[in-house]
């Protein structure tokens, strides 16, 4: 009887469990010739394709992905957006969660497929993301989403159609592409001492072309702001590139530049190609389609739209939001926007327009959305956005998503999920260029090398002092605490204009609870909220893993933002700018969350000891001459009341 009772209890327990499937995948990373935009170059293929294969799972699947490095250089793979709850060793960051995967070696990543939604995977080894190591990653949700769809339409047919579309989305990987490899591009920057950010193509799912419109057309398509404030006495090049030798772009370091070192075809010398544009087929019988856009771009902000088809953004960075209707949306490096599109127009071929938003270059990519059975029909259309990212219709000005427009950026989580009213720990990070046009800091002066601690990942040494200078690159937090990260931009010497920074936190999402203009002058966030409550939102702020800092081409005395999160997932997590050029220039910091309850690392992920194969473990780099550094000390003490790499006691409590 006792055994039967025990068996019955066991069966009840088993019946209540949600069994997760174990799903295994293999990725082979290779360096080969390719021509995604019609121009041949060396690049990275994953399983023989670019972008890498789509990885699709169900929520809470136990994922096991074996990565084989068939290249002649190091690599890792980061699973961007995956929570990595309890598996920080699978995050794929050299020097934090693992050593590099060396040539000929393999690495097994094991983690839970969570949270549901749209994510992606990419290299986290220097700038090789832009060489092609990236792909889409999608997790189908368990939950019934009908309440979400009812906010778009109350028609039961529409709700059913959207439910189906969300589980079988069209994954749309956006990337920018250059004829130069990442190493060649960075060498051009170092040799010329100029920040270069011009590309040849914008691709969708690995397809695109090089367009060379007449220069007069490009000049007429240039956004008014950059033209008048950033380079008022010059024009864009025949590639649509902003002029490289311009103080409004390079800052005071333009006088140190060597423009003759810029290789041909980076800034000018447009060569058209015969590539091919991507076509996505949709079935009008389905009623709706979900297009999930992934910004795998290195430094471009793409203003995507579909001619004649408004769209509803319902998911941002793998987090469901209150749906918002737009006709165009600007998406920036690292972000993911999932949109619902109603298929109710005349069947035919409609252009998907993919221009740079106008903040870095006059360039566009194109693709096609084709109604099934109407491939050869081209209904008359009028674009929402033009080649240069300008408004093509009146509604574009009022119904577009622009991250600088705080009202348009109001997309609170669904269901509601507000943060705590107060924080336990606060850290001020003063960000910007430090000592040159292409070196970037997150901590006033110190640069985070891309190979920092490559052979001694901080996962294994969370409480060990990493060196006097290196300590400026590390923040340690306690488990369960609420943390505020205060980001200050456009106040460092020579960096008065607020350039974009796409800030991505690994390991957890953050709420953006506040924005403001000027220099951060408060001893705490609580004091700031009391002084200017209109600058904060604690009721229903947005929740994302990637946020864009404020942008202004005109020096305005600085801008600040406050991001809040709770430490619930102990581990070493990178916080960095997702513009590859800025990260390569040093704009990262290590957040060692929950050092008081650090997880036990499985034996299979222990540090390996072997001769170096081209990997360097570099120290933090103070990048300034002594006079500049002394000036910075005086500035930080007088204006912000803190020293570089430090916070006031109130900020570090």
From Swiss-Prot:
Source organism: Ustilaginoidea virens (Rice false smut fungus)
The residues listed in the UniProt record as binding Cu cation 3, with positions renumbered to this chain, are 506, 576
Q: Which gene encodes it?
A: ustL
The record's keywords, sorted A to Z, are:
Copper, Glycoprotein, Metal-binding, Oxidoreductase, Repeat, Signal
Record's PANTHER family?
LACCASE-RELATED, MULTI-COPPER OXIDASE
Residues recorded as binding Cu cation 4, renumbered to this chain, are 501, 577, 582
PROSITE patterns attached to this UniProt entry: MULTICOPPER_OXIDASE1, MULTICOPPER_OXIDASE2
What are the top taxonomic ranks of the organism? Eukaryota, Fungi, Dikarya, Ascomycota, Pezizomycotina
**By what name is this protein known?**
Laccase ustL
UniProt-annotated glycosylation sites, renumbered to this chain:
74, 220, 235, 255, 277, 405, 463, 479, 623
Binding annotation for Cu cation 2: 578
């Amino acid at each position: 009887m006792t055994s039967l009772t025990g068996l019955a209890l066991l069966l009840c327990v088993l019946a209540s469990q949600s069994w997760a499937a174990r799903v295994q995948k293999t990725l082979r990373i290779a360096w080969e010739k390719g021509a995604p935009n019609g121009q041949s170059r060396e690049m990275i293929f994953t399983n023989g394709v670019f972008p890498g294969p789509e990885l699709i799972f169900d929520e809470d699947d136990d994922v096991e992905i074996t990565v084989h490095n068939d290249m002649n250089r190091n690599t890792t793979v980061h699973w961007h957006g995956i929570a990595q709850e309890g598996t920080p060793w699978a995050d794929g960051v050299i020097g934090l969660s693992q050593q590099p995967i060396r040539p000929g070696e393999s690495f097994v990543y094991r983690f839970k497929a969570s949270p549901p939604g749209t994510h992606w995977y990419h290299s986290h080894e220097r700038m090789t993301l832009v060489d092609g190591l990236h792909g889409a990653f999608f997790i189908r949700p368990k939950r019934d989403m009908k309440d979400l769809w009812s906010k778009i339409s109350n028609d039961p047919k529409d709700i059913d159609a959207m439910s189906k579309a969300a589980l079988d989305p069209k994954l749309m990987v956006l990337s920018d592409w250059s004829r130069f490899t990442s190493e060649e591009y960075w060498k051009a920057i170092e040799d010329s001492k100029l920040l270069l950010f011009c590309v040849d193509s914008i691709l969708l799912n690995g397809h695109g072309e090089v367009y060379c419109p007449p220069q007069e057309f490009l000049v007429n398509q240039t956004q008014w702001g950059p033209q008048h404030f950033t380079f008022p006495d010059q024009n864009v090049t025949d590639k649509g590139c902003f002029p490289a030798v311009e103080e409004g772009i390079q800052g005071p370091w333009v006088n140190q530049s060597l423009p003759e070192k810029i290789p041909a075809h980076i800034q000018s010398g447009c060569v058209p190609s015969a590539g091919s544009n991507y076509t996505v087929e949709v079935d009008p019988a389905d009623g709706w389609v979900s297009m999930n856009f992934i910004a795998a771009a290195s430094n471009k902000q793409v203003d995507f739209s579909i001619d004649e088809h408004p769209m509803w953004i319902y998911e941002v960075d793998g987090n469901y939001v209150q749906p918002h209707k737009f006709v165009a949306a600007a998406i920036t490096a690292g972000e993911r926007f999932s949109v619902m599109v109603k298929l109710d127009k005349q069947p035919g071929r409609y252009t998907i327009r993919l221009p740079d938003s106008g903040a870095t270059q006059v360039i566009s990519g194109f693709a096609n959305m084709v109604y099934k059975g109407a491939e050869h029909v081209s209904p008359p259309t009028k674009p929402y956005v033009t080649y240069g990212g300008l408004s093509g219709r009146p509604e574009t000005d009022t119904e577009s998503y622009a991250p600088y427009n705080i009202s348009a950026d109001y997309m609170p989580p669904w269901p509601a999920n507000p943060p705590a009213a107060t924080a336990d720990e606060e850290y001020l990070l003063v960000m910007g260029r430090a000592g040159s046009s292409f070196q970037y800091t997150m901590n006033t002066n110190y640069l985070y090398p891309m190979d920092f601690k490559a052979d001694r990942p901080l996962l294994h040494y969370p409480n060990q002092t990493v060196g006097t200078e290196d300590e400026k690159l590390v923040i340690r937090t306690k488990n369960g605490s609420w943390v505020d990260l205060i980001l200050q931009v456009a106040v460092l010497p020579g960096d008065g204009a607020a350039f974009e920074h796409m800030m991505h936190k690994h390991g957890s999402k953050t709420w953006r609870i506040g924005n403001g203009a000027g220099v951060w002058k408060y001893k705490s966030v609580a004091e700031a909220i009391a002084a200017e409550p209109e600058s904060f939102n604690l009721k229903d702020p947005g929740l994302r893993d990637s946020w864009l800092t404020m942008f202004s081409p005109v020096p305005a005395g600085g801008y600040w933002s406050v991001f809040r999160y709770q430490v619930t997932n102990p581990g070493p997590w990178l916080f960095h700018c997702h513009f590859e050029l800025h990260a390569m220039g040093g704009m990262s910091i290590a957040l060692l969350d929950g050092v008081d309850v650090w997880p036990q690392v499985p034996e299979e992920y222990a540090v390996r000891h072997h001769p170096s194969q081209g990997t360097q473990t570099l120290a933090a780099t103070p990048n300034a001459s002594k006079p500049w550094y002394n000036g910075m000390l005086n500035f930080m003490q007088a204006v912000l009341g803190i020293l570089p790499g430090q916070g006031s006691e109130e900020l570090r409590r």
